[in-house]
Amino acid sequence: MKETEYKRHRLADLLLVLLAALFCWCALQGTLDLNPQGIGMDSDLQNYAQIMEAGECPAAFARDPVASFFPQDPGVPNLLTALAGLLPDGDNAATDMLRVGALGVFLHFLAYYILGRCLFRSPSLAALLSILMSIAVHWSFGTFWGSMRSDPVPRIFYADLWPFLLLLACAAVKRPSLQPVVMFLSGCAMLVHTVSALMGGAMFFMAFFLLWRDRGLWRHAGLSLLNLLSFAVPVVIYLKVFLADTPAPPVEYAGLFAEVRALRYSKDWHDVWQSLADILRYYTFPVPLFPAAAVAAAILFKKRQQLAGPVRTLLRLMPGMVLGIAGGCVLCALEMWLARHLGRQNMSQEILRGTRFLVPLSWLLLTCLLSLYWQGVAPLLRRGLVILLAVVLLSLGQGKQVVAARHALADMAGLGWLDTEEARQIKAHSLGLRDALQALRAQAGPEELVFTDGDCMAVRFAARMPMLPVHKDGNVIYYAADPDMARRWLAMQHRMAADATGYMEVWRTEQAALLLTRHVEHKALLLRYGALLFENEDWLLLRRSPVAADADAQVTRSGYAD
């Protein structure tokens, strides 16, 4: 009987892995069709793509005022960009990252399925956990949990690694000698994703710190110190190797760079603690994820003797991991307070994005609660529930991966009803921009700069054209600590924010002769300052006329524009 069950489980494992691989392959094919050359993909990936393209083709960006600062971006390299650089030549760096990202999505399904199999043994419950973990859950600070929402970004690889760190941490509960190993690997995860690794380290440290029972005070203190050092050593090495060359903003320009940072991150960081409180409140009342997890935790602790051994071990880590997140927030608040009183920029704000780990901890608690009753449900019903959840998510899910997978399947099978209106809109916008970029390449002179009033970084990574700084470039401008570029970027952003036609003033007074804009409604007004080179439903491409350029140069010399 056991042999039959073993074979059935192995067959289920193989089937689920193949289905996950098929979904990820369809999502990749759909994404490559919806976003040719990466055009229109996630803006973080666009930023990485332009940095990689500038590194591979420096001559093409010799006149780009920002490209020389790209090496100062602390977000590059990361595991995603490093793996993308190893792929055989694709269309460009953007498509290479999309291919690596598809691997990340597949590993996400696989990692949480393995975690579920180790905790519960049941393939159906493991599949349920894997599906729950993939669901996109919005969080504060411009981040989210899950693998389905957008094009895969670097943090997905830490999410792939985290289940294995969690399993190793469970093993370390009974074998304390493994605790420093877990902490050391958590520190090494800085190479994967820095923000996640720092909050992950706090979670594991506090989880181990609370495991003091049956251990003398001094022995426990010594082990805790060793855990802390095991985590700190790789973190410090990472900071020294990868961030030591990042210049600090000059003290006399502290206010200038504070303004750059505030403007660049105004959308995600306008009110840090209120934003965090709002999202905690949202998942407490309108969407009761956290109350459900708390109830699950209470039931699990009450019935812990009925739990499987691995689940009982995981439950011992849970309180410490939640307290680790809280402790990480307290340390961030303290550092931010000190930075404000010392008149410098804080360094810990980004770590608060790691509070999103409250979501997977909640999913784990709810799935552990299900494990108490799962075996009492008829096998056919168990499998049916998992299949039903998967079908509902594939049918109703609005995440980019689901939309792309359905688009690819509709295209390959000739089933138009499978496609979505969102996919059709994404493709139409991407093709419209691709046509505009092709016209830009054909029309641009060898020494001409491009100006675009949106974050159209495809000018750099798809058309390989030098471009004036866009809003997203504020990040690297902040870390480059160049006062002149900071002033220039701020002036451009303020002029564009002043009114709907502010971008025209930037185009007329800056060095870029070419304008690529989505403001097709301003066509008549724009033709007063330049010649139309290309247009479609979404984009206009113009070259500034020499007369307008001379007039604006005279205005600038008179002091009016300044």
What residue spans do the PLM features occupy?
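Start-transfer (signal-anchor) and selected internal transmembrane alpha helices
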Residues: 1-31
